[in-house]
């Protein structure tokens, strides 16, 4: 990490001041990639998932936990075989998603649940593809899963499903929110968010004009509320103060009443704001209908060319992290804060 002329060595994870951006003393030594972060409801524990085997010279198999007050590694140490890509935590349970095949020596298929002490529970939904996103419903009666699967517990659910938080069995949910194609195209939910009433999903499609946009649905039934069909995959979404924010490489929102195809010089919009009521594009941070070019924006970066990969909030600000090197054409690498 680099801050105001000084370099700070960190191993796959670090922390910075939310007000200044200066790196803190939190510097665990993790020997592999970090793919997911989640706080316990009381914000005392930070769960870290990814593809690693050691933390601070102690064995931790793809999942670890730290005390936020001290930065110290806890005794939470379930042994997960497979990369942990998504985490959702309650006060007593931790739900895991990713490319999971076993936990504590017992078979699991892409998703699992452990207690806060690391003990494996009986919760074991069966999926035929990896899990990229997990969200606990506002009333805590459902777990929503998004990812590259076509079936949940043997029933057809394309890229998005809903299961019971205790039994892992399917809850009533409408298939088809993520479109099903029969021509080689495929779409999957990459990110989930909620405003306390509806659930929002962002999607990534593979193939020409496959669904890349966002949608909203009712948590009790899965009934579609709205769908925004902007083209250009959505990496992350976050709801904050009446606005649904989206990190993507959107390059054509004409079908959603926004900007048309960007040609001849393909330069997507990496940051967008949407109305959570109907999915229409907004001006950044407001509830008014947007002009075609929302601001701010990032570039795509030098590795993936996709820009933002993750959003977070302290309730007031939006933090964006990803593979970008500029914000509004000014140098800002990998992490930015917006008021």
Which role does the model predict for each range below?
Residues 1-339:
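Extracytoplasmic surface signature
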